[in-house]
Structure formats: structure tokens, C-alpha cells
């Protein structure tokens, strides 16, 4: 039975303007520490993959530094990470995700689901059906295309 660590809504890059400056800065740092802790937990529990189901980033306009720090924080777990864009960080033609790729910030073990489809994790013999948000607001069933998909050869 596959073992996943499932998480979502990190909202990295969020500004905590309702708090005192020091407290806001501490909350920002705590979010990066939380990603590091998730990586540690994935190792401790021998997870097959970490699934991040939307809103890794709070906005398309986060800094390059924030983008790099997010992906650096994942490095302790060398197994696959699958990240799906959400409504805050939708997979637009030009997005925080395409910027992360241009920056070379995305490690090889991190799979970005920037369009609907299947991500095959061959060493783990897993296929992940991904339905990312490709626009900020959507009203249709993002999983509808999956009904016609067939399992890849050699996968259950």
C-alpha cells in the first residue's frame, strides 16, 4: 500500500501585516520550518511521495528568494514531491511556477503538475492523476477527463 504525506495551502510569501513586524517575520520563518519538518516526517514515515495539493504560494508575485527557499526547504526528502497549483498560484501561461523553472529552483525530484494529466512515479510504481488549477477561478469539474484515462502499461 503506497504511503503519502498530503499537505496543502502553504501560502508561502504571505505578508502578515496584521501582526507586529517581529511577529510577522517569525510567522514567515515558521512556514519555511514547517516545510522542512514535512520533509523530515516524510523520511521518518518512509513515505512514497509528498503531495502538495494547491496554494504552495500565496500569489504569483512572490519574490525569487521565496521561490528558492521553498524548494530548498524540500531537499531533506529526496523522494518525489508532486505540487499542484491552486487558486492563489494557478498554472497560468506565465506564473510563479514558470518563474521557478526559469530560476532553476525546482529540484529533479519535485514534479510540478502545471496541466491536467498523469504524473508517473516509476520507481514507486505510482501514477498520480493531477487536476491543477490553470486559472484563478474555475467552475467545471477538473477531474472529468480522468474518466477516459487508462492505466499506463505495467501499472496497476
Enumerate the language-model features and the residues they cover.
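N-terminal active-site segment of His-dependent metallophosphoesterases
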Residues: 1-69
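His/Asp/Glu-rich metal-coordinating catalytic cores
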Residues: 49, 60-156
Amino acid at each position: 500500500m503506497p504511503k503519502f504525506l498530503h499537505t496543502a495551502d502553504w501560502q508561502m510569501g504571505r505578508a502578515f501585516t496584521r501582526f507586529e513586524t517581529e511577529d510577522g517575520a517569525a510567522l514567515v520563518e515558521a512556514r519555511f520550518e514547517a516545510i522542512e519538518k514535512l520533509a523530515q516526517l516524510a523520511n521518518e514515515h518512509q513515505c512514497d511521495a509528498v503531495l502538495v495539493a494547491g496554494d504552495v504560494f500565496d500569489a504569483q508575485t512572490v519574490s525569487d528568494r521565496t521561490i528558492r527557499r521553498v524548494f530548498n526547504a524540500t531537499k531533506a526528502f529526496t523522494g518525489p514531491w508532486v505540487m499542484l497549483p491552486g487558486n492563489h498560484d494557478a498554472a497560468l501561461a506565465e506564473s510563479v511556477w514558470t518563474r521557478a523553472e526559469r530560476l532553476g529552483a525546482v529540484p529533479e525530484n519535485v514534479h510540478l503538475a502545471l496541466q491536467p494529466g498523469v504524473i508517473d512515479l516509476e520507481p514507486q510504481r505510482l501514477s498520480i492523476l493531477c487536476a491543477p488549477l490553470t486559472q484563478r477561478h474555475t467552475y467545471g469539474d477538473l477531474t472529468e477527463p480522468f474518466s477516459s484515462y487508462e492505466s499506463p502499461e505495467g501499472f496497476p
